Amino acid sequence: VDKLHPLVLNIGLAIHNADWNWKNVSSPFTRLYYVTEGTAQILISGKIQILKANHMYFIPAFTKHSYICNSYFSHYYLHIYEEHQSDNNLLDNWDFPIEIPATELDLALFQRLCAINPHMTLQKSDPTSYDNNYTLMQNLLKNKQRTLSEKVESRGIVYQLLARFLQRAQIKMVLKDNRIEEAIHYIRKHINETIELGVLAEKSGLSKDHFIRLFKKETGDTPLRYIIRKKIEKAQ
């Protein structure tokens, strides 16, 4: 948990009337929703997820999805950006449930997060209006400019909400070899650069062939496939 540094990008209450319809959304931040009234749908991983009142929803960063809303729909939204994610994105190591039942405490936490961050609401629900590099940088700046007490309380609330999903999450892969774990950290940190297989093998103290075999044994992927997948995710 010492490596998890979630930052609040946006928090607020949104009310829609069949006007929450956006296709092929994919963002560098995680979305949490608490549905208060009405219903809507999300198309994610090829499946339709119905959004229901008194439930919370988790959409991981870099996950393509679409929104479908044909009637009244009210929900709290929370956008979380993981600081230092290029080095080691802790949330990326887990498979989270999309839906969990919500409690009165969850609702109170969302409401409190709204109360202490009134300037972090979305001006428009259209993802193209806020899911871009300029707005991301502006939101990160707003986050940094808050008082220390607001930062501490906000992060504490985000930890509590994430913990609710972590209770039902499954670890994606358990790395038994520290050399492969370090290689993955290096890949994430340098994902925007050209990553040479020879460099990874050398840092691990292994030959290329041995490194490839060990990497695949630990992750189920070859180093090249893993790097390509991460570059695609980053580019989306």
Outline where the language-model segments fall.
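Short, conserved loop/turn and helix-capping segments at secondary-structure boundaries
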Residues: F29, Y72, I100, E104, ...
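Short beta-strand edge segments in extracellular beta-sheet folds
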Residues: H79-Y81
